[in-house]
């Protein structure tokens, strides 16, 4: 039966069209996969191919295409009408039975599903609403009771009520517990969130506080410090090496200076023995010249003086050794020319040369501290301790400020002579002449030592005691000394013809040596940079203060005329080289005019101001005050307080000379009194631009009538910055 149903279903569900001709199927044929073809079409296809045209399944005799029985075919008309009727009837009956069976099965399934649905609905109701369930149960019980009143007992009802009560109580308790648990759950959730946040915070704090976080930064900082310390140590090592080299150089220079000093002492002893005879022969002639020219020098100058005092020339052997000998010998020379008792003064000078263990400052305090009446302080006097570079410009100037310099203009205008009652100490603005400066000049002393020893014979005075004590190491600064000798008009004695001829020859040789020495003088780059920085800083203040002083000072008018006199004398240098006889005569005339009287020299207890002018070739005047004091008592052979007041005006060119030259010029000034103005003008003409010329003081009244000056003006006039710029 089932097989017939499948066949019927198959025949009814076959496609109507053929896969090959795409037309209505005639005599349907199927392959293994139930693909329908027309029998004619499939026969034609199988002639060329052995596969199904739809699924490509091989069609072989073992698996041929099958014909469908009962399908629409051309053979149907061959059956009779009755046969076809019975076929249709049987076919419909089969379909009817099949459908009826299927309907019955479906009805059974629906009933089962309904019963299952009802049971599920009842379960849902009991779960969601137990009261309804109880009520439903009661209703059922009632129905049962009503239905079966004889079967229900009151005991069972009471039991069910008790159970119901207990169930309700349990339900209420469980409900309360659930609410409490919900609240506790909420609290726990909040606490959990707080703890999570606290945990995160603690983790972050631990990360921040961990020493490993900043470990690499600390290591880098320590490494940088170590590198910095290494660089510092290397720099200090280099500095120590440089200092060691410098110390070795200084020690070598000290050894050279010791050797040179020993040689100088030997040469001085030789010169002393050689010149003793000439000094005795010229003693009488010097005293005659002194008495002859006493009146002229007294009128032209309010007072005359010599070089620095003997008691000021006692520095220690470790500092200013060359300067000490220079100033001591200058003092001995000046006092020897002005004193009558030569032997007594010569012994005094020997004592001065032996005493070298007392510094200048302590000695000045000892000498001047014993005279409180003379040492009157002045309110305008100040000490300026300027930083001096390690150059020959360290000692810039000497200054002496006394009330007499400011008050004597009124007295001297009326022609009266007022003697000073105020004794002032020397003011050293840049007195930093230490062993460094002496070591720098030691090479210069060694270079010119041989020439200086020859020069001592040319410029020596007839008095032997003076030149015996003079050191020749500073004769190299003749460019400044010769010009100074032209202005200081207090030398005594005459020059013999032999000495004048020797002086002319030695002067020409000395000028050439000095020029070559000045040109070969070099300075290191470090010293030059220090000087440049030092000079540039002071140049501005110096220019402003010098302009204000030059505009106010009445001495400016007298400077130009004196400078013209010095320049006019420079043109006479050629005559000096060609006519040595005329040179001797002019030298004697100049010395006779500038000599001092014995009365003025013996008056050692009084102060007499004397003015000197140093004018630069560029006619730029600057003013600087300082005093050099020296006096000696020929009777008691004791060193007395100074008896002379020097007021010296420095120009720009003088400040370019080394710090030693300032004292060397003072030493050699008295020995060079014998040189004529033509010799100095020629010397200045041949010298380097740094050298200057001295011009005698002819307008002393104009200088003394100047108003009170400030200490700043003296600093500006002696500033090394302007001298360098000039």
From Swiss-Prot:
Bias-annotated ranges (Basic and acidic residues): 280-290, 446-457, 579-588
Biased composition regions of type Polar residues, renumbered to the chain: 319-334, 589-602
Protein name: ORC ubiquitin ligase 1
Zinc fingers (RING-type), renumbered ranges: 18-56
Residue numbers bearing the Phosphoserine modification: 210, 526, 553, 561, 568, 570, 719, 721
Main location: nucleus
Coiled coil: 87-129, 155-270
GO molecular function: chromatin binding; ubiquitin-protein transferase activity; zinc ion binding
Native organism: Homo sapiens
Catalytic activity: S-ubiquitinyl-[E2 ubiquitin-conjugating enzyme]-L-cysteine + [acceptor protein]-L-lysine = [E2 ubiquitin-conjugating enzyme]-L-cysteine + N(6)-ubiquitinyl-[acceptor protein]-L-lysine
EC number: 2.3.2.27
Subunit field text: Associates with ORC complex. Binds to chromatin; association is cell cycle-regulated, absent from mitotic chromosomes, is associated with chromatin from G1 and partially released from chromatin from mid S-phase.
Region (Disordered): 276-334, 436-460, 570-602, 687-726
Post-translational modifications reported in the UniProt record: Auto-ubiquitinated.
GO terms for biological process, alphabetical: protein autoubiquitination; protein monoubiquitination; regulation of DNA replication
InterPro entries: OBI1 (IPR039209), OBI1_RING-HC (IPR035691), Znf_RING (IPR001841), Znf_RING/FYVE/PHD (IPR013083)
Record lineage: Eukaryota, Metazoa, Chordata, Craniata, Vertebrata
Compartment(s): Chromosome
PROSITE patterns xref list: ZF_RING_2 (PS50089)
Top-rank EC class of the record's enzyme: transferase
Function: E3 ubiquitin ligase essential for DNA replication origin activation during S phase. Acts as a replication origin selector which selects the origins to be fired and catalyzes the multi-mono-ubiquitination of a subset of chromatin-bound ORC3 and ORC5 during S-phase.
């Amino acid at each position: 039966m089932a097989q017939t149903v499948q066949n019927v279903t198959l025949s009814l569900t076959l496609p109507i069209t053929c896969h090959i001709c795409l037309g209505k199927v005639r005599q349907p044929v199927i392959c293994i996969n139930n693909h329908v073809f027309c029998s004619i079409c499939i026969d034609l296809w199988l002639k060329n191919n052995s596969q199904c045209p739809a699924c490509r399944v091989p069609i072989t005799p073992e698996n041929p295409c099958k014909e469908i029985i009962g399908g629409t075919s051309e053979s149907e008309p061959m059956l009779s009408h009755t046969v076809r009727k019975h076929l249709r009837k049987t076919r419909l009956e089969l379909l009817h039975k099949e459908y009826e069976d299927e309907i019955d099965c479906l009805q059974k399934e629906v009933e089962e599903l309904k019963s299952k649905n009802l049971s599920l609905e009842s379960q849902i109701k009991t779960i969601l609403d137990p009261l309804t369930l109880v009520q439903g149960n009661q209703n059922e019980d009632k129905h049962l009771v009503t239905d079966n009143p004889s079967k229900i007992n009151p005991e069972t009802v009471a039991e069910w009520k008790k159970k119901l009560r207990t169930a309700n109580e349990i339900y209420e308790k469980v409900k309360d517990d659930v609410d409490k648990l919900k609240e506790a759950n909420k609290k726990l959730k909040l606490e959990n969130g707080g703890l999570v946040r606290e945990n995160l915070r603690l983790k972050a704090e631990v990360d921040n506080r961990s020493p490993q976080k900043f470990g690499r930064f600390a290591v880098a900082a320590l490494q940088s410090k170590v590198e910095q310390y290494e660089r510092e140590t290397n720099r200090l090592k280099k500095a120590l090496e440089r200092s060691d080299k410098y110390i070795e150089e200084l020690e070598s220079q000290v050894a050279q200076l010791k050797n040179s000093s020993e040689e100088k002492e030997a040469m001085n002893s030789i010169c002393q023995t050689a010149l003793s005879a000439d000094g005795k022969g010229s003693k009488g002639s010097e005293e005659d010249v002194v008495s002859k020219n006493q009146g002229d020098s007294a009128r032209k100058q309010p007072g005359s003086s010599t070089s620095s005092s003997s008691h000021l020339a006692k520095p220690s052997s470790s500092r200013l050794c060359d300067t000490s000998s220079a100033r001591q010998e200058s003092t001995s020379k000046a006092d020897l020319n002005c004193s009558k008792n030569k032997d007594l003064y010569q012994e005094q000078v020997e004592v001065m040369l032996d005493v070298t263990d007392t510094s200048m400052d302590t000695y000045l305090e000892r000498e001047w501290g014993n005279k409180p009446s003379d040492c009157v302080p002045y309110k305008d006097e100040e000490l300026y301790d300027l930083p001096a570079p390690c150059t020959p410009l360290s000692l810039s100037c000497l200054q002496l400020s006394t009330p007499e310099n400011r008050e004597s203009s009124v007295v001297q205008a009326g022609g009266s002579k007022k003697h000073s009652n105020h004794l002032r100490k020397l003011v050293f603005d840049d007195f930093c002449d230490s062993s460094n400066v002496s070591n720098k000049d030691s090479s210069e002393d060694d270079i010119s030592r041989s020439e200086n020893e020859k020069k001592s014979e040319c410029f020596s005075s007839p008095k032997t005691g003076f030149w015996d004590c003079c050191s020749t190491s500073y004769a190299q600064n003749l460019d400044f000394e010769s010009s100074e000798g032209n202005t200081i008009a207090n030398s005594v004695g005459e020059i013999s013809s032999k000495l004048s001829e020797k002086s002319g020859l030695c002067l020409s040789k000395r000028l050439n040596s000095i020029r070559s020495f000045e040109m070969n003088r070099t300075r290191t780059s470090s010293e030059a940079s220090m000087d440049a920085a030092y000079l540039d800083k002071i140049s501005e203040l110096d220019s402003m203060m010098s302009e204000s002083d030059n505009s106010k000072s009445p001495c400016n008018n007298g400077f130009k005329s004196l400078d013209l006199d010095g320049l006019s004398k420079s043109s006479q240098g050629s005559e000096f080289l060609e006519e040595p006889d005329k040179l001797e005569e002019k030298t004697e005339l100049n010395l006779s005019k500038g000599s001092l009287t014995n009365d003025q020299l013996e008056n050692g207890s009084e102060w007499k101001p004397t003015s000197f002018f140093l004018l630069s070739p560029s006619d730029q005047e600057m003013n600087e005050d300082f005093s050099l004091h020296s006096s000696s008592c020929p009777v008691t052979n004791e060193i007395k307080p100074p008896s002379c007041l020097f007021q010296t005006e420095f120009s720009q060119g003088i400040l370019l000379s080394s710090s030693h030259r300032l004292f060397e010029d003072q030493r050699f000034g008295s020995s060079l009194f014998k040189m004529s103005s033509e010799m100095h003008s020629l010397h200045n003409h041949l010298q380097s631009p740094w050298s200057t010329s001295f011009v005698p003081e002819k307008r002393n009244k104009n200088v003394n009538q100047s108003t009170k000056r400030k200490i700043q003006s003296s600093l500006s006039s002696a500033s090394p910055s302007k001298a360098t710029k000039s």
